Amino acid sequence: MPRSVNAVASKKHRKKILNFAKGFYGARSKLYTVAKNAVEKSFKYSYFGRKNKKRNFRKLWIKRINAAARENGISYSNLIFLIRKNNIKLNRKCLADLAMKNNSSFKKMIKKFQILYLDL
């Protein structure tokens, strides 16, 4: 009885891995075993990259809010405190966008808070 090998599926799988490895340098894009390791590692890095992207954007938003708040004479932590006290449902992304694109309304918002809470 001849040896049964599923060559079609094996070839398809190898081709899929080599397609993922397109653009990699040298053997990483040509040889299956090397490409398999490179693709696996790249998937791992892309997974962590997606998590880091969220972290980095949050940091950026906080820096932008802090810079805009300090221009108006209030610290970031006090601004967040005042926003929470007034039950304003704006997240950091919206606040950063407001501070960058519509600075005049951001200033008005801060002035209103400072009038309400003069002790800060």
UniProtKB/Swiss-Prot annotation:
GO cellular component terms, A-Z: ribonucleoprotein complex; ribosome
Keyword Ribonucleoprotein part of the UniProt annotation: yes
One Pfam family in the UniProt entry: Ribosomal_L20
UniProt GO molecular function: rRNA binding; structural constituent of ribosome
Coiled-coil residue windows: none
Position of the signal peptide: none
Superkingdom, taxonomy of origin: Bacteria
Organism: Karelsulcia muelleri (strain GWSS)
Protein name: Large ribosomal subunit protein bL20
